[in-house]
């Protein structure tokens, strides 16, 4: 299985995400309720969703998180996303740039993003396992320069690597030390990003206490990359595929992950992603502790249909976010971060089991600016 090229794998990943059922688990956003305010005190037109992220102003706290690149057809997806987020004033990340570092001829499928979105927050992307295999500051800077990125996400996908037919699940502590060292030499921040299994308090603490303050939760309830590798394994009669079925919903629900990360990274910046599917869930993520809402799969499905499809999807999300803010009496994103919320039983039990005091956490989330 080692001879499967990165290029073939990237195509297969996108194809499976588009045509197979890859969503498993719960985000637990159903356990987060915003309080309805019958008299908001202002009109819907007064609601402002503007925010700042990575030093740039955004029309709404929404990014399309890293998905793909590396082939002309995948570069076209990146190009479509970039054009739309530039027009709407949003942000985006690219998929893993390892392929462009190892195959220079594929760089254009990533660099097109900055050409089409000169003013938007753009996030570069490399995989954590590569830092065990020799990646260093040089490769990180190359990925950043390739797209003139405002930050670089280092994605952690241990659950996916375990079940990937050609996976290399090596997550030694060397990764932590390398990233801490690299972060001190960069002009842009590192974002610690999960890949569908959620970030825990423990992992957040490792990085936050060493100066890394940006996190992307990517919790359960959205795309299960274990399921993606299960489908790939089934096609190859790989023995791991049957075991993968036990772990399809493995991980931390997105809502719980947001709280776990915020409870540690109290002045950090958090992208709440993983199963976020609409503007109401963006509002819930931000009220709960995130700064930005992140989308991947629904944006991919819209983008492959063309620019208009993605534009319509994101306009709908922004409208839903505004409605949620209006009905909960919040005129700005700053107010939304402090709005009253009710936590349901399952999420409350999770947080209790993890030793997170809800009264104390409520004061933490409301201190955000």
Curated annotation (Swiss-Prot):
GO terms for molecular function: FMN binding; isopentenyl-diphosphate delta-isomerase activity; magnesium ion binding; NADPH binding; oxidoreductase activity. InterPro entries: Aldolase_TIM, FMN-dep_DH, IPdP_isomerase. It comes from the Archaea. It comes from Sulfurisphaera tokodaii (strain DSM 16993 / JCM 10545 / NBRC 100140 / 7) (Sulfolobus tokodaii). Keywords: Cytoplasm, Flavoprotein, FMN, Isomerase, Isoprene biosynthesis, Magnesium, Metal-binding, NADP. This is Isopentenyl-diphosphate delta-isomerase. Its cofactor is FMN; NADPH; Mg(2+). Involved in the biosynthesis of isoprenoids. Catalyzes the 1,3-allylic rearrangement of the homoallylic substrate isopentenyl (IPP) to its allylic isomer, dimethylallyl diphosphate (DMAPP). Homooctamer. Dimer of tetramers. HAMAP family: Idi_2 (MF_00354). FMN binds at residues 65-68, 96, 125, 193, 218, 223, 275-277, 296-297. It holds the Pfam family FMN_dh. Belongs to the IPP isomerase type 2 family. Gene3D superfamilies: Aldolase class I (3.20.20.70). Its main location: cytoplasm.
């Amino acid at each position: 299985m080692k001879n499967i090229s990165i290029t073939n794998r990237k195509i297969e990943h996108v194809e499976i995400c588009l045509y197979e059922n890859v969503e498993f688990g719960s985000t637990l956003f159903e356990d987060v309720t915003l309080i309805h305010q019958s008299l908001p005190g202002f009109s819907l037109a007064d609601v402002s969703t503007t925010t700042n992220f990575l030093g740039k102003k955004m029309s709404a706290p929404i990014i399309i998180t890293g998905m793909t690149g590396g082939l002309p057809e995948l570069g076209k997806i990146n190009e479509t996303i970039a054009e739309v987020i530039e027009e709407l004033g949003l942000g985006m990340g690219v998929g893993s740039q390892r392929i462009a570092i190892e195959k220079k001829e594929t760089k254009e499928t990533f660099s097109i993003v900055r050409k089409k979105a000169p003013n938007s927050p753009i996030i570069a992307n490399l995989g954590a396992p590569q830092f065990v295999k020799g990646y260093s500051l040089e490769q990180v800077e190359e990925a950043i320069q390739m797209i003139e990125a405002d930050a670089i996400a280092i994605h952690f996908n241990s659950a996916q690597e375990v079940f990937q037919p050609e996976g290399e699940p090596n997550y030694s502590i060397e990764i932590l030390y390398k990233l801490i060292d690299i972060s001190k030499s960069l002009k842009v921040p590192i974002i610690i990003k999960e890949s569908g299994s959620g970030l825990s308090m423990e992992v957040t603490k490792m990085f936050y206490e060493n100066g890394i303050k940006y996190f992307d939760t990517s919790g359960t309830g959205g795309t299960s990359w274990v399921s993606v590798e299960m489908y790939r394994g089934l096609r190859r009669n790989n023995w791991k595929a049957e075991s993968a079925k036990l772990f399809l919903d493995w991980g931390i629900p997105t809502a719980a992950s947001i709280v776990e990360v915020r409870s540690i990274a109290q002045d950090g910046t958090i992208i709440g992603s993983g199963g976020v599917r609409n503007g109401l869930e963006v509002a819930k993520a931000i009220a709960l502790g995130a700064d930005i809402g992140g989308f991947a799969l629904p944006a991919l499905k819209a983008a492959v249909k063309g620019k208009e499809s993605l534009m319509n999807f994101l306009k709908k999300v922004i409208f839903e976010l505004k409605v949620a803010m209006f009905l909960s009496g919040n005129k700005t994103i700053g107010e939304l971060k402090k709005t009253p919320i009710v936590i349901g039983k399952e999420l409350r039990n999770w947080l209790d089991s993890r030793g997170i005091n809800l009264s104390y956490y409520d004061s933490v989330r409301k201190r955000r600016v």
